[in-house]
Amino acid sequence: MLVKTYCAAVNGLEVTTVTVEVSLNTGVMYHLTGLGDEAVKESRNRIAAAMQYSGYKFPIADITINLAPANLRKEGSSFDLPLAIGILGANGNIPEDHLKEYMMVGELSLDGTLQPIKGALPIAIKARSEHYKGLIVPEQNAREAAVVNNLEVYGMKKLFDVIQFLGDKSSPTPTIVDTRKEFYENQVHCDYDYADVKGQENVKRALEVAAAGGHNLIMVGPPGSGKSMMAKRLPSILPPLTLSESLETTQIHSIAGKLGKNVSLIAQRPFRAPHHTISQVALVGGGTSPQPGEISLAHNGVLFCDELPEFNKTTLEVLRQPLEDRHINISRAKYAIDYPCSFMFVASMNPCPCGYYGDPTHHCVCTPGQIQRYMNKISGPLLDRIDIQCEISPVPFKDISKAAPGEPSARIRERVIRAREIQAERFKDFKGIHCNAQMTERMIHQFAEPTEEGINLLRMAMEKLSLSARAYNRILKVARTIADLAGSQQIEPQHLAEAIGYRTLDRGDWAERGHF
């Protein structure tokens, strides 16, 4: 007897429907075909034990199972449930009637308990697009999958519960989630606020410009000047996620198994801050069983690298292509995966090995050669991709002792949102372009063309600072954002002057300046 059940294989954000074909004949052999990995091959023992604890015997027969399409690699234990149901169906324990109506995924414990799986949300989206009536998942994944509308999602605790449901012996209620309500209720404000930051108005301004245009930013300053503190407050001034951005971000975290307990939608922009000892694979993704890296987990949010020169130089260099293309293609012998990674890159660093170069209150013990070698840990091509380079001075006592709080994040966020609305209108006819940082060269010529006076100012800056062509484009993008914040359609010389001031690390005299 031949029975078919349906499940899914996740490859990056791409989901493929997998048909589980089970045939029982006379004999005692067990054959599993279809490029399953070790976890799939080991499923036989889990399924046999789960059946026994559920009150069913594993059939003594020649069992042949094929996972179609056979040329697609299947990985993980989420195939346990469809395999078990297929075997039970072929053995006559479950009627075939409903099997074609449902997609199902889940790992089985030896006692028949369904364990949570990764990627429930993208699988649910695939099930809806393939017009399945419903999706059967472990109970812990039900709310995550139920975010997808027009699909019945059933969260099950045990294999026995699934058997009863498919055999019309029980009528469980599908899990229902009001997606929009869930999304807006979870849009809580950030715990940090720029009102807590005393002084550093120039840095707050740089962060505001970065948030308004989606620009990458690096802060350079001595220890204790507030670099990390201000970076952690950046999400408080970013525009809120849209529902489509939330779904895309949640899918990535779902695939990585990083969704928190009872979290069905990520409604806040991610803020990822990996340690400087992170490996290349952990940063960009991949591995034996491919997983999204930190750059993809930061998609639609912020990737913050504190103490940037302490990162391995080869690890930092792999950021160059993702920063430019906003997606990462990982190609290995057994797979090729593409993950989105459109994030704001924010970094901080000390100005020298001891940390006090240019600090008027501390003596720097580093030689010019040591300082230059330290700065050279950040390559020119990587710096070119950072739109805003901001120097931070220590906060003087008179600013620290002020009783009055700084400008609150809510007020800064209002200006950022207004600037983003201008950009949304500007790029409404351009697919995949949402902010000034994403402009192509053609768009720069169309939307960020300076005046004649501005061109002369740029020419002087290019010659004096020896800026690259990429830095030239970055200046125009930042100037366009500054003009948007000012509500100006035309990029004025003062907007360009401020943008040029954010290219401080492009200057070759860092080790000779002696001050910020």
Language-model segments: residues:
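Basic, amphipathic alpha-helical bundle interface domains used for macromolecular binding and assembly
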Residues: 33-44, 59, 66-76, 290, ...
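Short beta-strand elements
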Residues: 18-24, 283, 387-390
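Peripheral, non-AAA+ core regions of ATP-driven protein-machinery
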Residues: 1-218, 222-228, 331, 471-472, ...
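Walker A/P-loop
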Residues: 219-260
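Walker B catalytic acidic pair
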Residues: 300, 306-307, 318
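Conserved inter-motif catalytic segment of the P-loop NTP-binding fold
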Residues: 245-279, 286-287, 393, 434-442, ...
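The Walker A (P-loop) glycine that initiates the GxxxxGKT/S ATP-binding motif of P-loop NTPases
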Residues: 221, 285, 307
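Conserved alpha-helical scaffold flanking the Walker A/P-loop in AAA+ ATPase domains
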Residues: 208, 265, 269-270, 280-303, ...
